[in-house]
Design a protein with these regions (language model features):
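Catalytic core and acceptor-binding pocket of nucleotide-sugar-dependent glycosyltransferases
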Residues: 165-173
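An acidic/histidine-cluster motif and surrounding catalytic segment
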Residues: 68-78
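Short secondary-structure transition/capping segments
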Residues: 53-55, 75-76, 111-115
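Membrane-proximal basic amphipathic "stem/tether" segments
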Residues: 1, 128-149
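Flexible glycine/proline-enriched surface loops and loop-helix/loop-strand junctions
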Residues: 12-13, 152-154, 173
Length: 173
């Protein structure tokens, strides 16, 4: 079972990747905490943010300072986002729970999904899909209306996992 623990990752570089903690980040934390009432909402950071919105978010969070990894499996991690990717996976591997990117606004509780071992989102993009393909997809996928979106892969902006989930363990191998 996925524990009701939320994880957020931010501040893997001193300049925050040019994006200081903002209203959107605060709303991400606030909506997740209010809707899901987690046992803990853990904020993983190397460099602690500052500012008005950070001061509002801080009381909702348990702070966990981490050292951003420089490499994985002998390969250097050159981008801040890749360092954050590893931190989020390690956090879920260690305690399980829910990881949300800080631009994700919660609109419903996620507790009904906690019986799964692992959940990852699907990345979609608007695309032109020919009418005959849409009709086939509608029939095969049980859509109630025709969609004009296409999958571009998996998205790690929202992850739910049991502690030591097989999927994350394999991902980190």
């Amino acid at each position: 079972m996925i524990p009701n623990i939320f994880h957020f990752v931010f501040g893997m570089a001193p300049d925050f990747g040019g994006k200081p903690f903002s209203l959107v980040h605060y709303l991400s934390v606030k909506s997740a905490v209010e809707l899901n009432q987690p046992e803990a909402a853990i904020f993983h950071y190397q460099y602690e943010p500052t500012g008005e919105w950070w001061e509002k978010a801080k009381p909702l969070l348990t702070l966990k300072q981490v050292k951003a990894p420089e490499s994985i499996m002998g390969n250097p991690l050159l981008h801040v986002a890749h360092k954050a990717d590893i931190i989020r996976l390690q956090a879920l591997q260690e305690t399980g729970g829910v990881y949300l990117d800080l631009d994700t606004i919660s609109v419903r509780p996620l507790t009904s999904l906690y019986h799964h071992e692992f959940i990852i989102g699907q990345e979609l993009k608007a695309a032109f899909v020919p009418r005959n393909w849409r009709q086939k997809l509608k029939k095969q996928l049980g859509w109630t209306k025709e969609n004009s979106v296409a999958s571009t892969g998996l998205c790690n902006a929202v992850l739910l996992a049991q502690k030591n989930s097989r999927f994350i363990n394999r991902w980190l191998e």
